A protein has these predicted regions:
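Pocket-forming structural segment of enzyme catalytic cores
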Residues: 2-86
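Acyltransferase
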Residues: 80-153
Length: 153
């Protein structure tokens, strides 16, 4: 993880990798997701680790979904859980504080005009991500035999 000179802020395009992985089943080849952060995961560091696999990546925002240990660990670097107005609230809050260099949210407002409001372009993939996680990695992998729990470490 490394700190960035400029905040990654707004909606970024991602592409799927390892499409047969259940976590991204149903994803389009290219999809949008929100980011709001001052640091990043270094792609090359992830690729050097044989325990980690990048499932979705972005040229601009870096690795987005990383999976490890056959799905027992899942890392998401953006904010698919964000409501349509979350980035708007962050942007307006920082402007109201008079902060220097407040970044304009990338691909967030209709025609890049805040007065036209934001466009939520990530809802379907966010829902699919959480549905797949619950179905394939929580529900189907959860043992209901207390004696088996000790073997999951």
């Amino acid at each position: 993880k490394e700190l960035l000179d400029e905040k990654i802020f707004g909606i970024f395009q991602h592409h799927t990798i390892h499409r047969k992985t259940p976590l991204i089943r149903g994803f389009d080849d290219v999809f949008n997701a929100p980011h709001s952060r001052h640091s990043q995961i270094v792609r090359e560091d992830v690729e050097k680790n044989p325990e980690l696999t990048i499932l979705a990546d972005s040229e601009e925002a870096g690795p987005f979904i990383i999976i490890a240990k056959e799905g027992r660990q899942i890392f998401v670097t953006g904010h698919p859980e964000y409501d349509v107005l979350t980035l708007d609230g962050e942007y307006k809050r920082d402007l109201a504080k008079g902060m220097d260099n407040v970044p304009f949210p990338n691909r967030y407002y209709k025609d890049d005009k805040p007065e036209l409001g934001p466009v939520k372009s990530w809802r379907c993939h966010a829902n699919t991500l959480y549905t797949n996680w619950l179905n394939y990695y929580v529900y189907q992998m959860t043992t209901y035999d207390p004696m088996e729990i000790q073997n999951l470490k």
